[in-house]
C-alpha cells in the first residue's frame, strides 16, 4: 500500500525527527524485525517452560519488563502502520479491521497478565474455602508495643523472589538471562525505624535439626554377588535429654553395631573423648575396663580389681593435687559403675556414673576435671550374633569446638569439628572424623571392612532448626514447596539475622510455627515477621464433597484423581443445582452470579494421604469428633482471565479483516469505473 512520505528536507529538525520516527515505527521493516524477535522469544519461552516449568517461564519471560516492552512496541507499530495511512480508502477496510483486531488482542493479553488469577485452593473432604493461593509471597511485620496496646501491621511488603534458589543464578542456569527478571534483593522496606533486608532465598527447602550428622556406613567392595557397593545411610541428631526423649534420633544400629552421636560440653571433654580408649593389654575382666582421663593423664583399671576398695590414687596421678578414686557400685543390668573422685584425700567428692553402652548419658566430674568411659568385652557365639549387635560394637561420633589445630585441622569456618571412637572388642580407636567425606575405618565384617563417611554436618551450640535448600524440581506443585528467606530485620537499632520459612499452603490455616514467625525485641516494642503466600478471595465458596484417587496396578503412582465439588455463596446457599465433577483433563467453567466473573477450575494435584499418627493428621483432626481412617486433600487451580472476552473479540476482528481483504475486496471495494460520456450529437 503505497503512501507518500511525511518528512521532508525543508522541515525543521525537530519536526523532521518526529516524523521520521513516526515513519520508522510504521514501516514494514521495523514490523518484520519486531515480529521475528518476538517469534524467537516465544520459541525460547517454549523451551524454558519445557525445561523449568510454568513458574520459571512466567518469571523469566512472560512477566518481565522486556517482554512487556516488546509487546508494547508491537502495539505501537501496528497503530502507526494503520494511522499513517489515514484517511483510509475503501479498499483498505480489511487492513484497518485486521490492525484494530491485533490491537484489541494485545490489549486483552495485557489485561490477562495484569489482572488474571491463577491460584490454588487446597480442600479436605467436607470442607469448603474461598481463598486461592498464588505462587508469590509477601512479608508482614506485626509491631506490638511493650506493656500492651494496639499492634500496628506493616505490609503486605511485596517480595519478588523467582523460581530458583538464589545461589543457582549465574551458575548452573547461566545460559538464560534470568538477571533481566527483577528480584527483590537487599533492602525492601525501610520506614519508621523498621528495616527489612533479604539476603538469600530458597525456592524450596527442608528443615533439619542441628546439631546433626548425615553419615554413610558401608563399602565399595562388599564382595561377589552384591554388586560391590553397599552403603547404609544414617541420620543422627543430638538429643539434649536422651533418656526422656519420645523419639530416639541420636543412635542407630547398623552394620553389626551401633552408631551414636552427641555433643561435647567443653574442650576438655572433647580431648578426654579421644584419650579415653581402652588398652587390650590391661584386659577387660568380667565387669570391664574403666578408663579415667584426668587433665590429660589416662588411668586404666579393671573394675573387678577396684570395686569396693578404699579410695586410692591411680598410678601416674599428679603429685601436687593427686586424684583419689572410689568405685563403690556396679550395675550389671545397666553395664555401668558409680564412683567418687576428689582432689586430695580430703578434697570435696564428685559423683560419677559411667555407662558402657550409653556413653552419651555418662555423668562425668567436670569440676574435678575427670572424664570416664567403661569398656566391656562381650562374647558372641558366631558371626550372626555379631551382625545382630550382641557384641556391643559401637562407633561414637561427637561434635566438638575449640580444639587446637594439632588435634584436627578438619573443621568448619566456625571452628566445629567431628571426632569418632570405634569400639569392636577387644580393640578401640579414636581420631578426627573428616567432614569432607573422606572415609575412616568402621566395623570389620566377615566379608569386608566397612568404612564411615560424613555426607552432611550441621553444627550448633544448642538445639536448633536449620533451613536447607532442596534441588529444583519443575514438576513439583508450588503448593508443595517450602519457601525460605534469609533476612536481616532491624527494629529501632536492634538487628537480627535469621532464616524465615514461608507459611505452607495447606487445607487448614494454622498459627505459624517457630521457623515461620520470628520476633525481634527492641527496647520499646517487638516486631514479628512472617512470610505469607499471596492469596485472593474468589468471592464464593468451593466445597469438596468427595475426592477419589486411583493408583496404577502394582504401584503407588496415581493414575486418576478427581473431585466432586459444590459452589456456594458466602451465606451457604448453593449457586448451582447439582454438584460437579472436576477431573485431571476436564476442567469446569463457573460464572459467579454475584460478580459476573467467569472462572475455570482445574484438578491440579492432591496432598496426602495422612494416616492416624502422622503429624498433619493429628493437627488437622484435633477438633474433629469423628476422625476418618485417613485424610486426603484435593488441590484445585482457579483461573480467572479478565481479558478472555477481549482476546476473543480481537481474534474475531482479525478473522473478519483477513476475510475482507482477501475475499470481499473484489466485490465491494473495487475502484468505481467512470461512466461512459454520452456521444456528441
Predicted segments — roles?
Residues 11-25, 83:
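Cytosolic juxtamembrane amphipathic/interface segments immediately preceding
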Residues 2-5, 9, 50, 54, ...:
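Membrane-embedded alpha-helical bundles that constitute the cytochrome b-like, heme-associated redox core
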Residues 3-15, 625-626:
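Short, membrane-interfacial amphipathic segments enriched in basic
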Residues 671-681:
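Cytoplasmic C-terminal tails of single-pass
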Residues 30-90:
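Membrane-embedded alpha-helical segments of integral membrane proteins
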Residues 63-138, 632-635, 639-673:
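Internal alpha-helical transmembrane segments
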Residues 32, 57-70, 96-107, 580-607:
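Amphipathic alpha-helical packing elements
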Residues 121-635, 639:
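Soluble non-transmembrane domains of integral membrane proteins
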Amino acid at each position: 500500500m503505497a503512501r507518500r512520505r511525511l518528512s521532508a528536507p525543508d522541515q525543521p529538525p525537530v519536526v523532521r525527527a518526529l516524523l521520521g520516527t513516526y515513519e520508522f515505527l510504521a514501516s514494514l521493516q521495523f514490523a518484520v524485525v519486531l515480529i521475528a524477535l518476538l517469534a524467537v522469544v516465544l520459541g525460547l519461552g517454549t523451551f524454558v517452560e519445557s525445561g523449568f516449568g510454568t513458574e520459571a517461564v512466567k518469571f523469566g519471560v512472560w512477566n518481565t519488563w522486556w517482554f512487556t516492552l516488546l509487546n508494547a512496541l508491537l502495539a505501537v507499530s501496528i497503530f502507526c502502520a494503520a494511522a499513517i495511512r489515514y484517511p483510509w480508502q475503501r479498499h483498505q477496510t480489511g487492513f484497518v479491521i485486521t490492525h484494530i483486531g491485533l490491537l484489541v488482542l494485545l490489549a486483552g493479553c495485557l489485561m490477562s497478565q495484569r489482572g488474571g488469577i491463577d491460584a490454588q485452593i487446597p480442600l479436605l473432604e467436607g470442607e469448603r474455602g474461598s481463598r486461592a493461593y498464588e505462587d508469590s509471597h509477601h512479608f508482614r511485620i506485626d509491631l506490638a508495643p511493650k506493656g500492651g496496646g494496639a499492634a500496628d501491621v506493616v505490609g503486605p511488603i511485596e517480595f519478588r523472589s523467582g523460581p530458583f534458589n538464589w545461589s543457582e543464578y549465574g551458575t548452573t542456569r547461566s545460559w538464560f538471562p534470568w538477571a533481566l527478571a527483577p528480584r527483590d534483593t537487599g533492602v525492601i522496606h525501610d520506614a519508621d525505624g523498621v528495616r527489612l533486608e533479604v539476603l538469600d532465598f530458597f525456592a524450596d527447602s527442608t528443615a533439619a535439626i542441628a546439631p546433626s550428622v548425615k553419615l554413610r556406613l558401608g563399602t565399595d567392595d562388599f564382595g561377589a554377588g552384591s554388586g560391590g557397593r553397599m552403603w547404609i545411610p544414617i541420620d543422627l541428631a543430638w538429643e539434649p535429654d536422651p533418656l526422656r526423649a519420645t523419639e530416639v534420633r541420636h543412635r542407630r544400629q547398623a552394620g553389626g553395631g551401633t552408631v551414636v552421636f552427641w555433643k561435647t560440653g567443653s574442650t576438655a571433654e572433647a580431648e578426654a573423648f579421644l584419650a579415653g580408649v581402652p588398652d587390650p593389654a590391661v584386659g577387660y575382666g568380667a565387669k570391664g575396663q574403666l578408663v579415667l582421663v584426668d587433665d590429660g593423664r589416662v588411668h586404666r583399671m579393671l573394675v573387678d580389681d577396684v570395686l569396693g576398695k578404699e579410695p586410692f590414687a591411680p598410678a601416674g596421678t599428679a603429685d601436687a593435687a593427686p586424684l583419689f578414686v572410689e568405685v563403690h557400685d556396679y550395675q550389671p543390668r545397666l553395664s555401668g559403675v558409680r564412683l567418687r573422685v576428689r582432689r586430695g584425700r580430703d578434697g570435696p567428692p564428685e559423683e560419677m556414673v559411667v555407662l558402657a553402652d550409653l556413653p552419651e548419658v555418662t555423668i562425668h566430674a567436670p569440676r574435678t576435671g575427670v572424664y570416664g568411659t567403661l569398656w566391656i568385652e562381650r562374647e558372641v557365639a558366631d558371626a550372626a550374633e555379631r551382625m545382630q549387635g550382641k557384641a556391643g560394637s559401637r562407633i561414637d561420633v561427637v561434635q566438638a569446638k575449640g580444639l587446637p589445630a594439632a588435634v584436627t585441622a578438619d573443621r568448619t569456618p566456625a571452628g566445629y569439628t567431628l571426632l569418632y571412637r570405634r569400639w569392636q572388642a577387644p580393640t578401640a580407636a579414636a581420631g578426627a572424623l573428616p567432614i569432607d567425606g573422606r572415609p575412616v575405618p568402621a566395623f570389620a565384617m566377615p566379608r569386608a571392612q566397612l568404612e564411615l563417611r560424613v555426607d552432611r554436618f550441621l553444627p550448633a551450640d544448642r538445639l536448633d532448626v536449620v533451613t536447607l535448600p532442596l534441588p529444583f524440581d519443575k514438576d513439583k506443585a508450588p503448593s508443595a514447596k517450602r519457601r525460605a528467606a534469609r533476612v536481616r530485620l532491624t527494629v529501632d537499632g536492634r538487628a537480627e539475622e535469621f532464616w524465615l520459612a514461608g507459611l505452607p499452603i495447606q487445607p487448614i490455616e494454622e498459627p505459624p510455627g517457630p521457623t515461620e514467625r520470628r520476633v525481634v525485641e527492641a527496647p520499646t516494642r517487638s516486631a514479628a515477621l512472617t512470610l505469607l503466600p499471596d492469596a485472593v478471595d474468589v468471592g464464593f465458596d468451593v466445597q469438596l464433597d468427595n475426592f477419589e484417587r486411583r493408583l496404577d496396578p502394582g504401584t503407588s503412582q496415581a493414575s486418576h484423581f478427581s473431585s466432586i465439588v459444590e459452589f456456594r455463596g458466602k451465606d451457604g446457599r448453593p449457586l448451582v443445582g447439582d454438584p460437579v465433577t472436576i477431573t485431571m483433563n476436564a476442567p469446569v467453567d463457573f460464572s459467579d452470579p454475584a460478580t459476573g466473573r467467569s472462572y475455570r477450575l482445574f484438578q491440579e494435584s492432591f496432598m496426602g494421604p495422612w494416616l492416624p499418627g502422622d503429624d498433619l493428621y493429628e493437627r488437622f483432626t484435633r477438633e474433629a469428633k469423628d476422625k476418618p481412617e485417613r485424610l486426603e486433600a484435593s488441590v484445585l487451580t482457579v483461573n480467572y482471565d479478565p481479558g478472555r472476552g477481549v482476546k476473543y473479540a480481537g481474534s474475531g476482528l482479525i478473522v473478519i479483516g483477513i476475510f475482507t481483504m482477501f475475499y470481499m475486496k473484489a466485490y465491494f471495494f473495487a475502484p468505481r469505473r467512470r461512466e461512459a460520456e454520452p456521444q456528441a450529437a
